[in-house]
């Protein structure tokens, strides 16, 4: 049996919901080469027919049944997509009927409705959080009074992408502080962070993985040397333990999981956008 399987994330909006759920499902299966494609703004019958043709063509090309993760809210669009012969995984369908029964009200299948529930205030909060993350990246700005969280780690341990994810998806003002050679030499919490203990969260990483990442950026240097990576990670982990800073290894952990752990550990209650 072929290990290649085409997967399409189809939506009448951006496709982020379908792709996020689909990715979470696919990660449960190893040994497959999932060829993914996102088809966004499929919001009328003509676009749905074109999408179905693309899905069908992929099935013929790979000689295997495609998978469609579908978040279109209009049942008619879903029916057209199903004509492709793909395995249809509808994001909303399993929940709509029980909700209709519970609420004693029919749903309104308005295209794009599920993607238009974010008000201006929420949008403004997200943009402000993103600007904050960028201006407080890698220790650029050290005024952390307005920060919701400060990620602390050695260089290239995953601080920046986690901060950006927290900003975009939760509106969290996330700053990050890179542990410098001086910080690591002292093996103590840097003075500029001591007034913000309740906001600190440490990220650690397997030294071998850290070396791989650093080699891509600065190959064959002291910065990317195996001994340097082992030393920095060991000191950072001792510091987190000594200073009682909660921490998490990013080695085999997704950004989504890291972000969720940060929020729950620091007691930050925010709904996902």
Swiss-Prot record:
Transit peptide keyword on record: no
EC number(s) stated in the UniProt entry for this protein: 2.7.11.33, 2.7.4.28
Entry binding sites for ADP: 153-160
Reactions this protein catalyses: [pyruvate, water dikinase] + ADP = [pyruvate, water dikinase]-phosphate + AMP + H(+); [pyruvate, water dikinase]-phosphate + phosphate + H(+) = [pyruvate, water dikinase] + diphosphate
Superkingdom as given in the UniProt entry: Bacteria
Transmembrane region(s): none
Pfam families registered for this protein in UniProt: Kinase-PPPase (PF03618)
SS bond partners: none
UniProt keyword annotation of NAD present: no
GO molecular function: ADP binding; ATP binding; phosphotransferase activity, phosphate group as acceptor; protein serine/threonine kinase activity
Alphabetically ordered keywords of this record: Kinase, Nucleotide-binding, Serine/threonine-protein kinase, Transferase
Entry-linked InterPro entries: Kinase-pyrophosphorylase, PSRP
HAMAP family: PSRP (MF_01062)
The protein's role, per its UniProt record: Bifunctional serine/threonine kinase and phosphorylase involved in the regulation of the phosphoenolpyruvate synthase (PEPS) by catalyzing its phosphorylation/dephosphorylation.
Family: Belongs to the pyruvate, phosphate/water dikinase regulatory protein family. PSRP subfamily.
Stated name of the protein: Putative phosphoenolpyruvate synthase regulatory protein
Organism whose genome encodes this protein: Xanthomonas euvesicatoria pv. vesicatoria (strain 85-10)
């Amino acid at each position: 049996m072929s290990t290649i399987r085409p997967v399409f994330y189809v939506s009448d909006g951006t496709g982020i919901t379908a792709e996020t759920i689909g990715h979470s499902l696919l990660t449960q299966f190893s040994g497959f080469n999932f060829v993914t494609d996102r088809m966004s703004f499929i919001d009328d019958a003509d676009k749905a027919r074109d999408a179905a043709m693309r899905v069908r063509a992929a099935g013929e090309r790979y000689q295997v049944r495609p998978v469609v993760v579908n978040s279109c809210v209009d049942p008619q669009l879903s029916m057209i997509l199903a004509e492709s012969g793909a395995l249809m995984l509808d994001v909303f369908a399993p929940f709509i009927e029980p909700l209709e029964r519970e609420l004693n009200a029919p749903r309104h299948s308005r295209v794009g409705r599920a993607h238009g529930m974010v008000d201006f205030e929420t949008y403004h909060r997200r943009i402000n959080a993103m600007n904050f993350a960028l201006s407080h990246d890698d220790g650029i700005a050290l005024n952390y009074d307005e920060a919701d969280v400060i990620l602390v780690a050695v260089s290239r341990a995953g601080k920046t992408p986690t901060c950006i994810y927290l900003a975009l998806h939760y509106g969290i003002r996330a700053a990050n502080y890179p542990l410098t050679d001086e910080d690591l030499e002292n093996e103590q919490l840097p003075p500029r962070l001591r007034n913000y203990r309740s906001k600190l969260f440490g990220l650690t990483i397997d030294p071998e993985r850290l070396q791989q990442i650093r080699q891509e950026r600065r190959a064959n240097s002291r910065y990317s040397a195996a001994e340097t990576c082992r030393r920095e990670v060991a000191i950072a982990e001792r510091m987190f333990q000594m200073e009682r800073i909660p921490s998490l290894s990013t080695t085999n952990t997704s950004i989504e999981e890291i972000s969720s752990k940060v929020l729950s550990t620091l007691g930050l209650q925010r709904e996902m956008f």
